[in-house]
């Protein structure tokens, strides 16, 4: 029996080989103890402030919503050390690993952002680091691969399956099942077996807490909606967590529609998948008629995931959060618009959330609304991808 609730409604759980159950129980207990230990909280918050650069800014866009009555703020997780929201929870889990007496860290990464965040935390805290990464992602994210290596991490390309994030996840779990006595598996999103979805949410929830305080100070009221992209869902749950009880605030998650929801090239399991067991949890999953996991697709490597965190599945099921999808082309347009109109280059992941917010503003230009987009990461890692696409289209 788990000590914390392992399920969100019908979703979640702990579907892992028996050999991993003691490791997950140990992790759950360490997390419970750490949450009650003021010294742990103080060390974690200290690292976030002095090393990572929290709190991050809440920036009012000046030009993007001209011609509409929408006020659009960006929560600037792109300004965090490491370039994305990933740094928050990685520091928390790395401290937990040290607390459990483990000196090795295993991680998986898609876009490379979680890998970079894990590598920097391991360098800072003196932990050995090995990162599993789909061979395809190693190719399309070479700057991040080099960053990880610079900080002392070993990057292990995974060639099995589609050679993307889901395969890296499987290899990382396989490694951990043989090494958990000395190694901690530092999972990169709010998904996977319990207690990971809960741990990652709690180590990301400062995003929404800060946003709430900042918007109240600036506007004197809560936003009408907070909007975040959803792959596994950690940046979104970090933004949503502190607003779930605020019923006037719409929670909007944006999945990748890829080349179109009506094609087989998208990554939107929440709205277009079926419930299944994957990566140690029960959650919506992209699967074929035989129940085999289908490949997800997105121009953004960090959203290219065939499932989604169980709390998002639950929030969707009870109608508390709403989930929509944005295509590659719409995300690319938003990416370029933000760069040109505000001088901010967003991650392709975050561009999906931004594109949705721009639709909300432009579809109803006379509506006075206050929106916050979680700008979960910066776009340095994506400039080569975007350059190649625009070149192919003859757009540059």
Curated annotation (Swiss-Prot):
One of its GO terms (cellular component) is cytoplasm. Pathway: Amino-acid biosynthesis; L-tryptophan biosynthesis; L-tryptophan from chorismate: step 5/5. The keyword Metal-binding does not apply. InterPro entries: Trp_synth_b_CS, Trp_synth_beta, Trp_synth_beta/beta-like, TrpB-like_PALP, TrpB-like_PALP_sf. Transmembrane segments: none annotated. Pfam families: PALP. Keywords: Amino-acid biosynthesis, Aromatic amino acid biosynthesis, Lyase, Pyridoxal phosphate, Tryptophan biosynthesis. Its EC number is 4.2.1.20. The modification N6-(pyridoxal phosphate)lysine is found at residue 86. It catalyses: (1S,2R)-1-C-(indol-3-yl)glycerol 3-phosphate + L-serine = D-glyceraldehyde 3-phosphate + L-tryptophan + H2O. Belongs to the TrpB family. HAMAP family: Trp_synth_beta (MF_00133). Tetramer of two alpha and two beta chains. The beta subunit is responsible for the synthesis of L-tryptophan from indole and L-serine. This is Tryptophan synthase beta chain. It comes from Vibrio vulnificus (strain YJ016).
């Amino acid at each position: 029996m788990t000590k914390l609730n392992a399920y969100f409604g019908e979703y979640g759980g702990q579907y892992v080989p028996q050999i991993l159950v003691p490791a997950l129980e140990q992790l759950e207990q360490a997390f419970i103890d750490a949450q009650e230990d003021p010294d742990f909280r103080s060390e974690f918050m200290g690292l976030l402030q002095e090393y990572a650069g929290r709190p991050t800014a809440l920036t009012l866009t000046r030009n993007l919503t001209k011609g509409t009555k929408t006020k659009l703020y960006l929560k600037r997780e792109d300004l965090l050390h490491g370039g994305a929201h990933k740094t928050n929870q990685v520091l928390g889990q790395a401290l937990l690993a040290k607390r459990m007496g483990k000196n090795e860290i295993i991680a998986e990464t898609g876009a490379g952002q979680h890998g970079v965040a894990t590598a920097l935390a391991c360098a800072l805290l003196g932990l050995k680091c090995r990162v599993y990464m789909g061979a395809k992602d190693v190719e399309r994210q070479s700057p991040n691969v080099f960053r990880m290596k610079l900080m002392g991490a070993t990057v292990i390309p995974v060639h099995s399956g589609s050679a993307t994030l889901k395969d890296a996840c499987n290899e990382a779990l396989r490694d951990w099942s043989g090494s958990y006595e000395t190694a901690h598996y530092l999972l990169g999103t709010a998904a996977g077996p319990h207690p990971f979805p809960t741990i990652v949410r709690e180590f990301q929830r400062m995003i929404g807490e800060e946003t709430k305080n900042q918007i109240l100070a600036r506007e004197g009221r809560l936003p009408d909606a907070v909007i975040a992209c959803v792959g596994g869902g950690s940046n979104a749950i970090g933004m949503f967590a502190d607003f779930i009880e605020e019923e006037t605030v719409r929670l909007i998650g944006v999945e990748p529609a890829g080349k179109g929801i009506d094609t087989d090239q998208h990554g939107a399991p929440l709205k277009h998948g079926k419930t299944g067991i994957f990566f140690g949890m029960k959650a919506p999953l992209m699967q074929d008629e035989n129940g085999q996991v289908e490949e997800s697709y997105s121009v953004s490597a960090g959203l290219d995931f065939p499932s989604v965190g169980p709390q998002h599945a639950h929030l969707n099921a009870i109608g508390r959060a709403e989930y929509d999808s944005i295509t590659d082309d719409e995300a690319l347009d938003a990416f370029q618009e933000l760069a040109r109109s505000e001088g901010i280059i967003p991650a392709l992941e975050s561009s999906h959330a931004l594109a949705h917010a721009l639709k909300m503003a432009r579809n109803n230009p006379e509506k006075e609304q206050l929106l916050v987009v979680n700008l979960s990461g910066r776009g340095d890692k994506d400039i080569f991808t975007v350059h190649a696409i625009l070149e192919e289209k003859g757009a540059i």
